[in-house]
């Protein structure tokens, strides 16, 4: 719009705004002039084209400069009336103004209050009526059309953008609903990306209402069906069905908690699957712990458009362990120990109540080993650790036996005899070393017999796998026992995926703790060995929602 020229000093020239207001009031005096006025401001009358040079953006400032002339008690400016028209969801109807074509105004209001009429247009016309304008008389044969259309920037905006897809609108509704109830939108995941294995927990809601199921977007249904209807994913992904926690209540929803694992070397396939299933349309952030949360952060962002909320793995380990133990294992205790571990014939698994767990020595046996002294839920310290862990066992077995998987290595170890590989106390002393209480069957030197060519030629791959397993397990047990004595803690809890389907190591650890402490130390184990970090990450997802 071209700027108005300011009046010269001393001039009697009437300001343009005043002339415009006088002209508009004069034209409003008759119904016929009202129609001409509508044409002047560039509004179609009965479907005619707008006149060039009188477009809406030019006329709107005039309307805002005019003073209210209607009979309403509200003396607000046209700006305020326009704002009401834009913002109010239930615009009030202006009362008829005497001498301003009430009949025409009734037609106008009737049209705008009819079903399907835009609310913003009705409010805008009401604003005009309040400021001394009336529309032209409408023909009774033709349906009346709105006389004034707001600029796009003043139009009332719908709750969701008009161009959004139904799936996106549904996702936004789910997020708003979740926000009101202080819980995150589905799906609910927690990840622990370790050096050897990725552990994933997924909460499957079982209390979905008919309305939720109807509004559920297709890719969310696809993810749930894919994860819960399969027990294997590709060549290496496994869902541990026997560990599933059923009828669990988490964050106010009832459902089942699933436990899934796959090798870390297959992480790129998982990220690609997340991209193909458009996971970022459901979530923008995943809660993840473990070293891989840092290593793969950029890949998640670039390939799957996902952000990783990185969490401390030891914090998640403790929080997840305490939570799973508190809910139990489908009506059974999560924790157990081995009774009579020094007697193979009488040794058997027994449940253990861990209601009062503090203090405890927590030995996390993954690719490597970390040992924590835990004094309360939020008070713990890392005492020590060792690089000789589950990764060492599998790596050496692959070198020595040619096996390729953890399961294959354990299967071979179960069939082997480590005494053919290790040098024992009796091989040196001819029997027990009684002065220090060393039995002749105790290992004096791991792999000590492999110095002999004859021994090397007589052993089997299974013997090598068993000796490797015994070596790693004895080393961990020895360090754990010393830490327990130094910290004056009599309960040692062993967790981690090194113990998965590894009954040989568990019984060896139970035997070592009991024998070398003369029954003072008890080795404890948990059913969900290596998944506690992932559970802790899932719990953090709920905490994030509470904080927000």
Swiss-Prot record:
Q: Name one GO molecular function term.
A: pantothenate kinase activity
Protein's recorded name: Pantothenate kinase 1
Entry's EC annotation: 2.7.1.33
> An example of a Gene Ontology BP annotation on this entry?
coenzyme A biosynthetic process
Phenotype on disruption: Pank1 single knockout mice exhibit reduced hepatic CoA levels, a reduced rate of CoA-dependent fatty acid oxidation in the fasting state, impaired gluconeogenesis, and mild hypoglycemia in the fasting state. Show a reduction in pantothenate kinase (PANK) activity of about 50% and 40% in the liver and brain respectively. Pank1 and Pank2 double knockout mice develop progressively severe hypoglycemia and hyperketonemia by postnatal day 10 leading to their death by day 17. A reduction in PANK activity of about 90-95% seen in the liver and brain and hepatocytes show reduced levels of NADH.
The Phosphoserine modification is found at 30, 165
Compositional bias segments (type: Basic and acidic residues) = 62-83
Q: Which UniProt keywords apply?
A: ATP-binding, Coenzyme A biosynthesis, Cytoplasm, Cytoplasmic vesicle, Endosome, Kinase, Nucleotide-binding, Nucleus, Phosphoprotein, Transferase
Pathway recorded for this protein: Cofactor biosynthesis; coenzyme A biosynthesis; CoA from (R)-pantothenate: step 1/5
Q: Which InterPro entries match?
A: ATPase_NBD, Type_II_PanK
Enzymatic reactions: (R)-pantothenate + ATP = (R)-4'-phosphopantothenate + ADP + H(+)
The task this protein performs is described as:
Catalyzes the phosphorylation of pantothenate to generate 4'-phosphopantothenate in the first and rate-determining step of coenzyme A (CoA) synthesis. Required for the hepatic CoA increase during the switch from glucose to fatty acid oxidation that occurs in the fasting state.
Q: For the motif Nucleolar localization signal, what are the positions?
A: 1-8, 168-185
Q: Which organism is it from?
A: Mus musculus
């Amino acid at each position: 719009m071209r700027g108005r020229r300011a009046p010269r000093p001393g001039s009697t020239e009437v300001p343009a705004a005043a002339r415009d207001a006088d002209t508009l009031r004069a034209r409003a005096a008759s119904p016929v002039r009202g129609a001409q006025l509508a044409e002047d401001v560039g509004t179609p009358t009965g479907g005619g084209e707008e006149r060039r040079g009188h477009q809406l953006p030019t006329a709107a400032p005039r309307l805002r400069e005019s003073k209210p002339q209607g009979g309403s008690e509200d003396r607000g400016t046209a700006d305020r009336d326009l704002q009401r028209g834009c913002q109010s969801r239930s615009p009030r109807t202006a009362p008829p103004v005497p001498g301003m074509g009430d009949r025409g105004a009734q037609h106008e209001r009737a049209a705008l209050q009819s079903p399907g009429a835009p609310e913003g247009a009705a409010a805008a016309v009401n604003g005009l009526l309040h400021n001394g304008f009336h529309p032209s008389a409408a023909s009774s044969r033709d349906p009346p059309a709105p006389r004034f259309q707001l600029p796009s920037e003043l139009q009332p905006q719908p709750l969701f953008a008009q161009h959004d897809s139904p799936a996106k609108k549904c996702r936004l509704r789910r997020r708003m609903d979740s926000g009101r109830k202080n819980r995150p939108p589905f799906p609910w995941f927690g990840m622990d990306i370790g050096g050897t294995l990725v552990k994933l927990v997924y909460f499957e809601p079982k209390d979905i209402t008919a309305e939720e199921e109807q509004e559920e977007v297709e890719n969310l249904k696809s993810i749930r069906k894919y994860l819960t209807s399969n027990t294997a994913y590709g060549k290496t992904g496994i869902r541990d069905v026997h560990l599933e926690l059923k009828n669990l209540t988490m964050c106010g929803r009832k459902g089942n908690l699933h436990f899934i694992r796959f090798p870390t070397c297959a992480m790129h396939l998982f990220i690609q699957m997340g991209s193909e299933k458009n996971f970022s349309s459901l979530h923008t952030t995943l809660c993840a712990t473990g070293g891989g949360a840092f290593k793969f952060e950029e890949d998640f962002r670039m390939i799957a458009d996902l952000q990783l909320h990185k969490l401390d793995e030891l914090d998640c380990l403790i929080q997840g362990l305490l939570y799973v133990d508190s809910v139990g294992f489908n009506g059974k205790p999560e924790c157990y120990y081995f009774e009579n571990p020094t007697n193979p014939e009488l040794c058997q698994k027994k449940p253990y109540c861990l209601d009062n767990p503090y203090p405890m020595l927590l030995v996390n046996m993954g690719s490597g080993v970390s040992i924590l002294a835990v004094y309360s839920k939020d008070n713990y310290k890392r005492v020590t650790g060792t690089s000789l862990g589950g990764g060492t066992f599998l790596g050496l077995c692959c070198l020595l036996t040619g096996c390729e998987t953890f399961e294959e290595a354990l299967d071979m170890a179960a069939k082997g005899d480590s005494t053919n590989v290790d040098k024992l106390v009796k091989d040196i002393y001819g029997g027990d070393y009684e002065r220090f209480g060393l039995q002749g069957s105790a290992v004096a030197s791991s792999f000590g017999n492999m110095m002999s060519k004859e021994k090397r030629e007589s052993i089997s791959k299974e013997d090598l796998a068993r000796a490797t397993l015994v070596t790693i397990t004895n080393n961990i047990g020895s360090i754990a026992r010393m830490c327990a004595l130094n910290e004056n803690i009599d309960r040692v809890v062993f967790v981690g995926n090194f113990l998965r389907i590894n009954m040989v190591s568990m019984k060896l650890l139970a035997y070592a703790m009991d024998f070398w402490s003369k029954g003072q130390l008890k080795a404890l184990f948990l059913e969900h060995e290596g998944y506690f970090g992932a559970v802790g990450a899932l719990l953090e997802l709920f905490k994030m929602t509470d904080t927000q």
